[in-house]
Amino acid sequence: MNFSRVLFFVFACLSAFAMASAAPWNPFKELERAGQRVRDAVISAAAVATVGQAAAIARGG
């Protein structure tokens, strides 16, 4: 009798936490963020290369 009450209480707590949890994990959102980081890195790398070329031209090389 006591064991069934404890088991019921644990089950009730778990179901309450499951119902009240935050938004579920979305793998596509993580994939989109990774793509944005790659895009930003490519844009940044191109800008760094352009600045390096401009500095070389300014030095007369």
From Swiss-Prot:
Domain of life: Eukaryota
Record's subcellular location: Secreted
Keywords: Amidation, Antibiotic, Antimicrobial, Immunity, Innate immunity, Secreted, Signal
One Gene Ontology term, aspect cellular component: extracellular region
Propeptide regions on this chain: 23-24
PROSITE patterns found in the cross-reference section: CECROPIN
Modified residues (Glycine amide): G60
A GO BP annotation: antibacterial humoral response
Signal sequence, renumbered to the chain: 1-22
Similarity section: Belongs to the cecropin family.
Purpose of the protein: Cecropins have lytic and antibacterial activity against several Gram-positive and Gram-negative bacteria.
Protein's recorded name: Bactericidin B-5P
Organism, scientific name: Manduca sexta (Tobacco hawkmoth)
